[in-house]
Amino acid sequence: MQPASANNAGSFNDELLAVFKARKPWLVNRKIVSSHIFTPKYINNLINSDSPYLLSHSLQPVDWIEWQPSFESDFKSGDKLVFVSIGYSTCHWCHVMAEESFANTDIADILNQSYISIKVDREQWPLVDERFKSALELLKGEAGWPLNVILTPEGKIVWIDSYLNKDKFTKVIQGLAKRWQKQPKAIFSLASRIEATVNPDPLPTSNPETNPLSKSDWRKLLPKQHQSVYQALLNEQRPGEPRFFREIWQLGLLDEYLRTGNEAYLKAVENQLSEILLSPVFDAIDGSFHRYTVDSEWKTPHFEKMLYTQANMITLLAKAYGITGKQHYRIAMEQTIDWVELWLKNDSGYSSAVSAISEGQEGKYYHFSETPLDSGTVNVAGFKVVNRFTHDIQNENVQNYLISLDSLDSDWRELTSYQELKKYRKQKVKPELDEKVIVSWNSRYAIALLDAFEVTDKAEYLENSISLLESLWQAAKLDGELYRIVFLGRASIPPQMEDYALFAKAQFRLAFYQPWQTEKDDESKRKFYAQSDGNRVVESVGESIDESETSIMTTSALHDSSAATRGNWLLEQMMIHFDENGEHDGKSLYAKITNLNTDGEQSSVYTSVYEALALGELYSQSPVYKKLIGRFTKNHSHLPIEMFKHYSFVSSVADSLSPARLNHAIFAKGHGRIKAFYSEPNLNSKPNEVSHGGVIKVTFTMENGWHVNANSVSKSRFIPTTVKLDRDVADSQTDTDIRYPEPRIRKLGFSDSKLALYEGRFEIFLEGGVIQEGELQKELKSIDIRIQACSDQLCLLPETIKLNL
């Protein structure tokens, strides 16, 4: 694609000028252009983009164009080399290179004359970024942004690097342009050598189908994988290297603690969380977390804040609080949610990130100046000075400080110093937002809100998750198609696999809290999952249905507010859009996903798709989903290093074999739900008096037409519903009063006798009896529920469900 030249001032067309005028208020607000400029000197095609990062390059003299899906097969560059530059809005060095090089007319002349120049927002096109980042890591040992690549017209790498100053960058693009003109064969030869390094011929391997991983194999491998991650977390601190939170590792270890009771795993996570919360990487004043630290001791944050970081940390803190009951986890979680709601919420969802830079200086919003701290005008009691920075401002050295919490022993939000520090910070200029709404990131946050609700029972978290998912459904889905990005009210960019998967996962998670579907809905679902050839989803128009009909999911989900229906529609669309063999059986989907990213700051796409399919299968009993899930688990690499890189998937497989639940569960193949909640004991008793124990309420909801046997059964062949406490201390057997509801007496199709049943919604209460203050909460480990679900026609196998409070 040849862009209209922007090399000469004012050479752009009227269409670009019209778009500029429409977007001028936003550009002025972001200080990209002055309000008194009516016709800029340069406008390029990025003015049409739905990315704040790309828009910041839209008035540069370079003839930039956006990445397009068609570039995967053909750049249409004619005989020109292709220059691809990848970055993102909160990347400091991306903006430095933009000012030094891409705003420079001499460099623009070279690029415009000799290259097709493509600018990529890595958050819009994560797989494009992943491909070139992996190549840079292979060739140079490490990768960073901006990520700059020069390609042949066929798309083979000729040169790749990250930030270069203006002189070095000029030398590279000039040299390769001249060589391309004079010795194109030499360029092709160089590209072939690089291609051989980046994409070598695969080594012969055994066919995974002939040596699949069975459940028994997984059970043998899993303990080693958890131990490997545990050791990695302990050894993480290496001098001079950046440090990330490792939420994926910590969540997996907490789950394994729930399964095994291995205290070392819990201790490792608690130590890591304490270090984070007592460091400036946690913003204890506004709430929320910076992305990572540039040092190994959590002292110097990289100051940008990402929506996905907040989502991951909310989920981690919710689980830590659910397991330990320690209030500082809940406080940090609540603060982070409050920050996201205040800073990131917009009409279509939540903005993707907050920049590190304010007033032209990295981290300035978070710094405290020497004068207020030294003079005592700002009360910092309960906080500590962690790091000091020296800045050269107008030839004067100015001292700035970072502060963090000094203790986690009390609610820091109640400190006088906390209020004073908030007041001091409000005087500062806030860093800028990247307002684009990313479907997958927003879905992660919706899931995090549900995680927070499940351990706090705070209704606003559930309400916010519902509102967010509805906003995404309305804003990111147009004419039956999902899009990845919503920016300034406009949906764009084809969805990535992670968008389908995480949006579907969020919908299925929400379905737990929605009313059961009606019988009509169930019939629609049954028809949709009917099989035409043994393993195939019914297509929108296929040989197994009438030509005038459309897929039940495709039509109903577009208007249905049922989260489960919407989740299934998203999975159907994912399988269709990433299908290449026309069979809709998941084979080509699986082939694509095996080459996608490994765990990083976010869990891998492989894991996200697997988890979405697992939830979809639970709610729909789809044989297609079940078969594809089996392919994921059986065909995964046996190599320890591959399992380490996909630890989020390893954790998910472990959970499928032995669920690590907190206070809720789905049972009866999706036809029943349980949630348990603990209310504190009465602590108003006098000193040295015993207090009444807390009450655990276990709430069951059964789908219409399903039931479980009552606690007392008429015949021994029926399994009664029982609930009991499992305690840490075997010799501390405080009496527990368990109150079961009155059963309903009914006669069903499979029995001539009247049966005592529980159906619909019912509750079982466990009261701790007379115990010392707080004893129940300390010694309680879990609740064991024995249950058997039946419909009017059949009974499922009995289940034992363990919940942890």
Sequence positions of predicted segments:
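Catalytic cores of eukaryotic secretory-pathway lumenal/extracellular enzymes that build
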Residues: 37-43, 61-63, 87-92, 103-104, ...
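N-terminal pre-domain segments of enzymes
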Residues: 3-55
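Local sequence-structure signature of Cys/Sec-based thiol-disulfide redox active-site neighborhoods
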Residues: 70-103, 107
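Loop/turn elements at helix/coil->beta-strand transitions in domains of secreted/extracellular proteins
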Residues: 78-82, 114-116, 153
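Extracellular/lumen-exposed scaffold segments
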Residues: 640-805
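Short, ordered coil/turn segments that flank beta-strands lining enzyme active or ligand-binding pockets
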Residues: 58, 153, 285, 704, ...
